Amino acid sequence: MEERYYPVIFPDERNFRPFTSDSLAAIEKRIAIQKERKKSKDKAAAEPQPRPQLDLKASRKLPKLYGDIPPELVAKPLEDLDPFYKDHKTFMVLNKKRTIYRFSAKRALFILGPFNPLRSLMIRISVHSVFSMFIICTVIINCMFMANSMERSFDNDIPEYVFIGIYILEAVIKILARGFIVDEFSFLRDPWNWLDFIVIGTAIATCFPGSQVNLSALRTFRVFRALKAISVISGLKVIVGALLRSVKKLVDVMVLTLFCLSIFALVGQQLFMGILNQKCIKHNCGPNPASNKDCFEKEKDSEDFIMCGTWLGSRPCPNGSTCDKTTLNPDNNYTKFDNFGWSFLAMFRVMTQDSWERLYRQILRTSGIYFVFFFVVVIFLGSFYLLNLTLAVVTMAYEEQNRNVAAETEAKEKMFQEAQQLLREEKEALVAMGIDRSSLNSLQASSFSPKKRKFFGSKTRKSFFMRGSKTAQASASDSEDDASKNPQLLEQTKRLSQNLPVDLFDEHVDPLHRQRALSAVSILTITMQEQEKFQEPCFPCGKNLASKYLVWDCSPQWLCIKKVLRTIMTDPFTELAITICIIINTVFLAVEHHNMDDNLKTILKIGNWVFTGIFIAEMCLKIIALDPYHYFRHGWNVFDSIVALLSLADVLYNTLSDNNRSFLASLRVLRVFKLAKSWPTLNTLIKIIGHSVGALGNLTVVLTIVVFIFSVVGMRLFGTKFNKTAYATQERPRRRWHMDNFYHSFLVVFRILCGEWIENMWGCMQDMDGSPLCIIVFVLIMVIGKLVVLNLFIALLLNSFSNEEKDGSLEGETRKTKVQLALDRFRRAFSFMLHALQSFCCKKCRRKNSPKPKETTESFAGENKDSILPDARPWKEYDTDMALYTGQAGAPLAPLAEVEDDVEYCGEGGALPTSQHSAGVQAGDLPPETKQLTSPDDQGVEMEVFSEEDLHLSIQSPRKKSDAVSMLSECSTIDLNDIFRNLQKTVSPKKQPDRCFPKGLSCHFLCHKTDKRKSPWVLWWNIRKTCYQIVKHSWFESFIIFVILLSSGALIFEDVNLPSRPQVEKLLRCTDNIFTFIFLLEMILKWVAFGFRRYFTSAWCWLDFLIVVVSVLSLMNLPSLKSFRTLRALRPLRALSQFEGMKVVVYALISAIPAILNVLLVCLIFWLVFCILGVNLFSGKFGRCINGTDINMYLDFTEVPNRSQCNISNYSWKVPQVNFDNVGNAYLALLQVATYKGWLEIMNAAVDSREKDEQPDFEANLYAYLYFVVFIIFGSFFTLNLFIGVIIDNFNQQQKKLGGQDIFMTEEQKKYYNAMKKLGTKKPQKPIPRPLNKCQAFVFDLVTSQVFDVIILGLIVLNMIIMMAESADQPKDVKKTFDILNIAFVVIFTIECLIKVFALRQHYFTNGWNLFDCVVVVLSIISTLVSRLEDSDISFPPTLFRVVRLARIGRILRLVRAARGIRTLLFALMMSLPSLFNIGLLLFLVMFIYAIFGMSWFSKVKKGSGIDDIFNFETFTGSMLCLFQITTSAGWDTLLNPMLEAKEHCNSSSQDSCQQPQIAVVYFVSYIIISFLIVVNMYIAVILENFNTATEESEDPLGEDDFEIFYEVWEKFDPEASQFIQYSALSDFADALPEPLRVAKPNKFQFLVMDLPMVMGDRLHCMDVLFAFTTRVLGDSSGLDTMKTMMEEKFMEANPFKKLYEPIVTTTKRKEEEQGAAVIQRAYRKHMEKMVKLRLKDRSSSSHQVFCNGDLSSLDVAKVKVHND
């Protein structure tokens, strides 16, 4: 029977045994035996239960290993191949496609047995692939019907009944085949079938005409039929599984997000309740002005009402109106904080950054500008941190799944390798069994190709059967190690060979064993054959056909032509010429614009013909040179040929039809992609998109299904009311965004996926009469679509990027593009010419300056033969100098120190003098290109030195220079400054100045020669030393920082109001002069102290120098230098060189700049394609005719059809500032689309456009939306996420480069080190003593009990709920009740505070949480008192004090100890804070500089669009408010629009100060790139990195909390905090600990193994116990002893009194001593007994003599205890 448990794998039909009644009886017998074993609880007989095998799971394909399925057994019940199901009443069925299905062997529906003919028929139907395809087709057709049909009619119902019938039939077939619910593998046991069940149930309910259910709601369930596609396609199931896993992992993030959102919502509710309905009401406006819209003042050129406030910093009302509360809130009464629900929705909107700038502006106008800090917290903590944690979690979930898949693939590859090795091993064993070796050889020879045979022949390993011998074990150790790392591999290997005999020496070999051994070999043979077959590129017949017709070898003359052409076409210069043609052609394409003159059109037309001819010629010549067979095997050649043929078709079409506008003309832009061949980064981007699209195939289908479902759900639920004609007004006759049909519904869902959901939701609620269903559906689309699916997309993209980056970097080191090779040729030719010229000039110089060249040469040769003039020799001559700098090849010596010469002197003619101190040429005198740094790992990487210090390092052979250059590729993010900074630390700091000028300068110019020992120079040297000491002094640095801050602060006051304050203006001019002179003086001091050489070789000093030059130039009041005053805004940049935190971030940014610029260029090229396409599609079509009196009144196209008619009718023809009239404008338009700001106006104009200079019509060009959809997917999604990829990748590279300590530790050591690091900071604390006073003691017991804490927590939650229940429009009675409850809570928490102080006495104030509670109570009392006062009595809003009550909620945080996941997230935030603070500082600096520039350039811009009284560039505050808003790219289009209006939007009095629109575009685009794309992405990178670290830490076996709990338990056993407990108490202590440190009783023996040290009095120290318990959890490892000693030393430093307690014994030694004592006692007792017996024998016969009768009690032997204290 045991033989049947683990069936042998045969490579043929013997694997497949039909499932018969005997099979069922055998299963029942096995189940009975299993039950008997369980009853008898026979542990010896119990076996570990096998797991289901992954490759044999249901719905997977049967592995090829099992051979082909016999035709007669297809779709028939078979015995299960998986050993796991040996005692389950199941059988398996395989279809023709080898898909595995499992069924229960019990009766289906209690009627149909496994052998029933009807059930067998149903099984055959349900497993057939045609049945699955039929269901998929039905689902697709049904989806198409759902997307098209809207109204219910008889015609629509007929197909619905057909579909329902098909689904019911499918369910019936499956139920008859599987059973309904009771048994294993029955219909409802599969969760995917639950979906079918619900769909059918709802469909039947909707079919009955008399049913009372809501049919339209139930009909929306039909749409979930689309999910049936997932249940049929196995690949989709995997992706959905990954999605569900990521959702599981997101639980902690979601809980934390909801908690933070609730806090923000409560804060918002308390702060802004009833404030957003404040508006400017006109004076004397009727009886009820608060509810009359006509009484409200409106914004200029807008339908919005003016919002105002009465507090400091809020917006005042214009003359003729007053600020008062009304009944109307903004955005159709949907934006408000009047209750918790609306407040929560508003905060969710801010967190998702959807139209948040609108809410931000509304709050600041009504409440005051100081509430900007509330938004800073919500945006940075909520939006940036929590939403990016979602990204981090999803990325980790995806990567984890990816690792598992990779591990499985690796396991299979290893299995093939094992197979290759096993084949050879089995030969000897099979021969020993009596199998002919020749037959085996013939089998192998016939089965494998020569390549494989060679591979097999090269391996010599011991036989698989010789496991007993040591040699066999040794040889197999490697593979066993590999296998042990992967249990799946081990399992599969076992399955291959589990029943092979182990005993080789058994003479009577079982024939079955021999058969098994043979089958194992044949399986491996078949497997290898299949693998080879799989790896073959194409069929042999195809290859023959191709070589016959597609390889042209006609004649020798033809071959000569081919050879010449091949040489020409594959030459790098040809590739360079083609690339130049592509670039020129791209320029030609980009030059096209609206209203071109005829000459330019002709030039572009001819150019197009020429380039088409060139590309066609290139294609033809390459085909001739390479043959079609080889030409079309390369992807780029195929692409080139497609582009060339399309261009040719375009030219022919234009020539024949005289129509210059065709779709083919738009396809010319594909030529731009030809650049990717010679541009590696563009190539990488295209590869990433290609790989991602390939890998994302299944995910794209899932996303499509999700979008389809939501589109149809929206259409079904809201389509009747939420349509284009709902709420029609004169201003907005038709709605653009609605769900009237599938196309518009899809666009709404797509817009939500782009992040814009709130405006659509308002429209839906307005049309659906405020239905909450709108909120539910739209938030669901946002959460499911945006947060989960798109984040998985991003995770995949980042993963593709990092993989591609790895591949690309490896290729980049070895291969160059042909264009690079061609450029290298030019570079070499130029270098050769330059060198020849240099040599020629130097020869002439030497002849003039050297009258005795022979003697000079001889003298040089005598002293140092290699000291030739460095500039005059070629590279080769430096090879001979290697002996001077390196002891041997590749082994660098210590750096050569600079010779401390007192004399800066050179020999005649610039030759260097030789000295007894110098050995050879000094490194400082070599040309700059030879100053190179040998990498510390001795790999021959060379880099040019450009550090500040004189680091003269060893030189390597310059022959490797080209290799080094290629390694430092354009994508390299190596920060050389970091390396040099690390090296500089090793060099002792100089205490005196460097030389003033470079040596080369001193040698060639006599005026620069100085001698420190001679009189004029001694004074100079002393002055320099004094200056050096001054600039190096810490006070000097502090003073300069102070001056920088003051000078930056002074710039704030230079705003638009300065001319009206002459005193301030005068003071600022004076301070500006002082600051300039201070900076000038500092620069001169540094020149004198450091010398020009050192000063001008530092990048920071250059920055200081340029800023000082700008400051000096701005002092000269020359008209031509007026613009330099603006550049003083760069002055705060000096702070960068002074603050270390910002320096670190800047270094990280600088190191990423090459990669960022590369990606930026690639994005520009990628966008150029869409720009050119946009210009072709929309140029000249955005203009429209308007009625000049009303800017918003667009005229109908039936009245004014075109521009000429508009001009005739005296109307105005208006073209939007952002359009597609040329490529420059197109770039700006696409940036607005990519950032989703101002994109709706652009899309509306595109969709309404008809033809050039024609009046647009509503949605005349409806499918223009698709252009923007495609651009957003490829241009925005892929390219902008590439920025995140680059920066994260750069951060990872930097960490690898700098994080050295972990490299030298094993995984066990790392875990131990982390644990030690955590516990090293902890020590036991003395518990608070219980008071002696009875009353105090009672209160003490009360406040320290757990019940008290739970009650207080309950009260906090109750208080939070009551605060949530408050609303703005609540009745007075309810308000009064809430006030009383609030006072009651304040009283309760005050009493809690007082009784704690009473019970805990002074110890109360030693706990941080208690202090926090105390502060909250005091503030609550103050806020309660303040809120009683009237608003008029105080000058600040009392709402500010009501917020203080919310701080009480913070106490809940101390009770979330059980929520480990949330703690991890908060820990990640804490770890991120230092880095985030530095990034925040840098962002503030950027904002500060841009604010100053903004004040200089845009202070006179007329108000309009996004520029108003509060948000403007007139003052520093207004500028910072605007810049904070556009840090998230929000609303930057509204700030830019007024500035694009150039002169007409300037104030008439200040035309001179009005800037060009181009400056505004550069200003905003550069700020968005710097802040939004770079700094914010650095923020994301830090969070991702720290989240990974925090997750790793949380997954450590021991965390901070484990150590804290250890010490909490310790306090109970050590109330005096002596750090010692008695050995007798150790057992109870160890048992009282929680897992994983707990050592459960009985634990005495485990303490002996731990060998714990004890001190006098049998006491144990806490650290010794903790070390031992930690080692027990982590496991002992080599190398931990050193670390343990190190950590003990660290602890002893922190706790010096431990040194007084030196351990005198250990638990093990004590046990040994006790055992020794017991042995001695026993021996002594035996000795005494023997002595007594002897004495009794020899005793005299005298009767009065008495002895002890053998009773040893009087000797107290048993009580003797040996103490060795």
Swiss-Prot record:
Residues 340-364, 742-762, 1224-1245, 1516-1538 dip into the membrane without crossing it. Keywords: Cell membrane, Disulfide bond, Glycoprotein, Ion channel, Ion transport, Membrane, Repeat, Sodium, Sodium channel, Sodium transport, Transmembrane, Transmembrane helix, Transport, Voltage-gated channel. Belongs to the sodium channel (TC 1.A.1.10) family. Nav1.9/SCN11A subfamily. The lineage of its organism: Eukaryota, Metazoa, Chordata, Craniata, Vertebrata. The keyword Transmembrane helix applies. Induction: Down-regulated after axotomy and up-regulated following hind paw inflammation. Down-regulated in vitro by electrical stimulation and by deprivation of NGF. Glycans are attached at N214, N319, N333, N660, N723, N1187, N1202, N1207, N1210, N1547. GO terms for molecular function: voltage-gated sodium channel activity. IV repeats lie at residues 1328-1619. Residues 1-126, 178-189, 237-252, 398-567, 627-634, 683-697, 799-1029, 1093-1098, 1140-1158, 1289-1341, 1401-1406, 1464-1478, 1585-1765 are cytoplasmic. GO terms for biological process: action potential; action potential initiation; acute inflammatory response; artery development; axonogenesis; behavioral response to acetic acid induced pain; behavioral response to formalin induced pain; behavioral response to pain. It comes from Rattus norvegicus (Rat). Activity is not sensitive to inhibition by tetrodotoxin. Pfam families: Ion_trans, IQ_SCN5A_C, Na_trans_assoc. This is Sodium channel protein type 11 subunit alpha.
